[in-house]
Each structure stands twice: as C-alpha cells, then as structure tokens.
C-alpha cells in the first residue's frame, strides 16, 4: 500500500483518480481549494487539506511522507480557455510541487505525474498530433501548460525528479458527485438535451476532437506513476480517433431519444479546428491507449447522469 498526494483532488479527474487509488488499497491525501470541487468528492478514508497549491508551506507539508504526487490543480478552467486571461498563471503551483517533491523524498525525490493538455499543440496542421511537435499555444492557459512541461523537464534533469506529463485530449465522463459537474462540451450538450434545451455549436460544427473517457484517463495516471521514468516524459492521452462537434451532438440526441434545436454561433477566438492525438508513444512506453469507444462512453455517462436514468 502506498500514500499518494493529489492536488486538485476534488475536481473532475482528481476525484475519480482518488476513488480508484483508494479502491486499490492506497492512502490518498488531497489538496484542493474548493473552487471547482465538492467536499463530498473526497475519498471516505482520505485526508483533505483545503488550500491552494500556490501556498508553498501547505504543499511542503502535504508532500511529507508520500510515495508519489499527482498534480492536477489548476488556477484556470481550460474549458473556458477562450475567455483568455493574460494574467492566468499556474507556474507557482507547479514550482511548489516540484521543489517539495525534490526535498520530501528520503532517498530520492518524490515522483510527479502531472496533467498537461492537448491545447499546447494549438491549431496544428498535423492531423495526428505527436509529442515531438513544437508547442504552439493560442491562449494563456495553453502557454501555461507548455511552461509547466518545461519546468518539469528542467526539474527532472537538474534535480532527478521523475516527472511524467500527460497531455489530455477531450476528457469526458460522469460527474464525480451529484452536486458537482463534469466540464467540457460533452457534459454541456448532454445537460442541454436532457433538460430539453437547444444546443449551441460555435463555428460550423466540423471542428474535430479526440474524446477520451474518464476511466481511461485515470488509468493513464495510475500506470504512469507505477513506471517512473529515468528522463522527463510526456505522453498523449488520446484514442487516435476524431469526432466532429456536430457528430457528437447527433450521437447524444440519438442516444437520449430526443431531438433538440441546434443553432450556430460565431467561432470563438482560440478555438482549435482539428485536435486528434497520436497514441503510439504511450502504447510503446506505457502499454496504454484510451480504448473506450465514444458511443460506449456516452452510454455509460448517460446511465450515471442524475437526469438520465429514464433513458438508460
């Protein structure tokens, strides 16, 4: 049994990760500022420290005695990246995590697996985005993620901290708690359809995304922690399959057995046209790819939705 720290552990992915770790018999310690999470998302036997990763003393205390750190806390919602905040800055939290990981280990630094994002690729002409492509961030949130990756790389090379970054594509899945909410376009569309409201598509609807089921993303974090790298590593968390936003809307309407009005709005600044990942590096080194088919993941999400029981 191991003890793990999860920053942002009450959020969408963090809460699911904590539950999986606890189910496997591990001890879970969480830092969360409650800005996007709910207390009831914490694991029953876990330890919750309410605070922000920008608090260096809190992070240092939380890192003491842990066998690994999952860093998922963020100061900005990537789901609203178009509302670009020039002042958004996640680097202080990452620096606190890395410095504490360097100092907390008794024999060697604490391994860190952190959440990055496919938005670092920007609006790239490549139809299959691989990890060796240069970052082309279009928003401050994307630039933050790229900077965090560089900080992790330096920490690994200079201080021997095992760091693994996971570039998450479009993660979707059931909300971690009835009073919490999933983020992203899938949750937004599903909520609107079940409530009988219309759907708004920004742009022409032909923009594509690589949708990753939540349970698959969680498995990536756990597997990456079990395989601490000798060199700083980054992996796509993706299926390698693309689905257009209009196709997603049609799939959800069909799944729910409801027809709702679909309207178009102007494309948003910073919105990416095509985003589909190449899973080969993760397959080679982690033995993983996000394998849940979108239709299956949507059905599971609907079955667990508070308003979806009548349609499951």
Residue ranges of predicted features:
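Non-catalytic, hydrophobic alpha-helical segments
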Residues: 69, 217, 221, 237, ...
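Glycine/proline-rich active-site loop of Rossmann-fold NAD(P)-dependent oxidoreductases
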Residues: 146, 171-187, 197, 202, ...
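PAPS/PAP-binding and catalytic site of the sulfotransferase fold
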Residues: 244-256, 297-301
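Active-site loop of classical SDR/Rossmann-like NAD(P)-dependent oxidoreductases
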Residues: 36-38, 245, 266-281
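Residue-level signal for the nucleotide or nucleotide-sugar donor/cofactor binding architecture
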Residues: 54, 89-92, 139, 143, ...
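Amphipathic terminal alpha-helices
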Residues: 2, 294-312
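Hydrophobic alpha-helix immediately C-terminal to the catalytic Tyr-X-X-X-Lys motif of short-chain
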Residues: 147, 151, 155, 185, ...
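N-terminal Rossmann-like NAD(P)+-binding domain of SDR-like oxidoreductases, especially those catalyzing
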Residues: 1-168
